[in-house]
Curated annotation (Swiss-Prot):
Family matches, as InterPro entries: ATP-NAD_kinase_N, ATP-NAD_kinase_PpnK-typ_C, NAD/diacylglycerol_kinase_sf, NADK
Organism phylogeny: Bacteria, Pseudomonadati, Thermodesulfobacteriota, Desulfovibrionia, Desulfovibrionales
HAMAP family listed in its UniProt record: NAD_kinase
Subcellular location: Cytoplasm
Active site: D65 (proton acceptor)
Keywords, in A-Z order: ATP-binding, Cytoplasm, Kinase, NAD, NADP, Nucleotide-binding, Transferase
Family: Belongs to the NAD kinase family.
GO annotation terms (biological process): NAD metabolic process; NADP biosynthetic process
A Gene Ontology molecular function term of the record: metal ion binding
Gene name linked to the record: nadK
Catalytic activity annotation: NAD(+) + ATP = ADP + NADP(+) + H(+)
Record flagged with keyword NADP: yes
Annotated protein name in UniProt: NAD kinase
GO cellular component: cytoplasm
Amino acid sequence: MHTALRSILIVTKSGHREAEALGERMRAWLAARGLSARVVENTGDAVSLAVAGQECSLALVLGGDGTILGVARRLLGSGVPLLGVNLGKVGFLAEVAATRWESSLERLLSGGVTVQERLALSFRVERDGATVHSGGAVNDVVINRGILARVINLDLRVGSERLGELRADGLIVSTPTGATGYSVSARGPLVHPQLHVYTVTPICPFLNNLLPLVLPGEARLSVTVRDRTNEVYLTQDGQEGYALQAGDVVHVERAPGGMLFATIEELSYYRKLKAKGFIKDQA
């Protein structure tokens, strides 16, 4: 879908002078063309970011994939589309190269913004019948072991149906957006970002008793921690962690509203896979 630009929120990587300077140049460039723009630093405060984004029609995020992930997670359900400007190394989530930002914004102003709705995940940790922790994820929800090199025991259910017990280093529940992250390193599948599915991929499973699964977006996954001797942690997007206990049940499902990514279609998904080395053409 397309959306008209009214005002723009520019979010810069925390403590990054290049991002701050570029943000100010963008603000001045947009103001000269009659658009309202505000520059804020990504401090990690979800409330202040949500308030800043209430009246904007687009969020420009200046940084690497980590910065884009953090901002996208805090904007879940806000209805504000996000467009990444790459100042990092990989930049798979970024649509715009920092060296070509002016021409990219010109395209935005001339044609409007094309917005893609992508699946995101919500999760909650149930302990003794009560919810003790909850949150959302743009890339993945990971359950894994602590510092000791031991497998952990997890029990998996999809809806009311039990899949079985998994003995592994951990488990990755990934969105299509996160399929090119931790999941693919664990031999999870590449998934087109516009598909409304999510994947379940074991990390080094003992005896390979569970292959990667692709679940429909409507499915609800429940993971029970059976391990009583090892440290087990839940992490969201590789950025925020939470210690789990034996008997905890992690419920994962599709987040309402999902997340919105703006695109100017400079590089198709398949060309991006090739450019980032996920597909190698031998011809």
